[in-house]
């Protein structure tokens, strides 16, 4: 279950990547200036110098913080489930069956139980790594690569920006500068693929989701352990299901008659079937999804971002953009599980994933700055800093005519030299606020006034009733005598 902050940009309705920071202007030296929403809190000078070097490597190679009592309960339940499935099937099903079946030799028993116990050992070890390994935190003072945030523009576009900046130095040019990802909860920049987890109360590197069964976030430094844990759970549960089914079918008995299980065996067979079948179905489906994410090099949150981006492209809000982290099947798997296929399934192999979690390789044909520009922002979403809020003394949340939800799409416009009380009115389209960048019309657009055209006095429009099929219904009139 994912449990990240809704303000983090992971959900389609989130806006955290736009919160806290936005590009404001280009000065005469053509250097972007950054402004924060928390300047009033005394942080106006924080992280504005582009010459400050990036921070050191992230916090790695350390254990996570101690478990809380609720996390201890989740971990204990998980370990109890593994123990019940793993050991009850051996102690109360397979060993009694071995004792009363002469044809079931010790070599055959060892050939059945040794692989099963190796699978259990791999499950326990990978689960311990998932719980105790820190997913990765953003180092204090980290800053993005500022040169990668500036869009690649042609010479003509650059000359135009210089001319505009010289004429109006304070003109807002947000389209010319990309906003870096910023976490308003942590008051810090966010590296690519990192998100804020409100359960862990921090930004996690390459966050996939927060798993309550692990009592930990699945992130950059424990993602490989999580994939191996799912793999061994699937393989061992399937082996467990085949093993107890062989007992039910009496497959190890070379005699002709079937040896019926006793009452205790029957009870534990039912318990093992009741627990193993739901686990292998639920974890199996969950594993298939994460194996697919591994093949395309995406996280659970990034799959939501890709769906949101596809929706914006389909509606014409943004241009078609390529997902920057899909390197191909071979490179995608190597980036998570390690360089050699011989250690992909080895528990604990590749304890440290490739890279530091702050910067990632991108697909062919893309520049390194594409990872800082993913996911694309929705241009139709109003930025929170551009809203007009009422003063603290006002009892209303929005001042008059500033609520964006109640902004009508149609309004009445009056011609020049006329008052709103005049009976002569013209209806025209009222463009939504703010106007689209592709629309050449201004926000308040009135039709041009022709002085040679005399206004025509038209009577007021009479309200007309219409039936369910759209036909006009005459109003009721009194009976005439």
Curated annotation (Swiss-Prot):
GO terms for biological process: protein targeting to membrane. It comes from the Eukaryota. Residues 1-22, 370-481 are annotated as: Disordered. GO terms for molecular function: protein-cysteine S-palmitoyltransferase activity. It is a multi-pass membrane protein. The keyword Transferase applies. It catalyses: L-cysteinyl-[protein] + hexadecanoyl-CoA = S-hexadecanoyl-L-cysteinyl-[protein] + CoA. Keywords: Acyltransferase, Endoplasmic reticulum, Lipoprotein, Membrane, Palmitate, Transferase, Transmembrane, Transmembrane helix. Residues 441-452, 466-475 have a biased composition (Basic and acidic residues). Mediates the reversible addition of palmitate to target proteins, thereby regulating their membrane association and biological function. The DHHC domain is required for palmitoyltransferase activity. Belongs to the DHHC palmitoyltransferase family. PFA4 subfamily. This is Palmitoyltransferase PFA4. It comes from Mycosarcoma maydis (Corn smut fungus). The gene is PFA4.
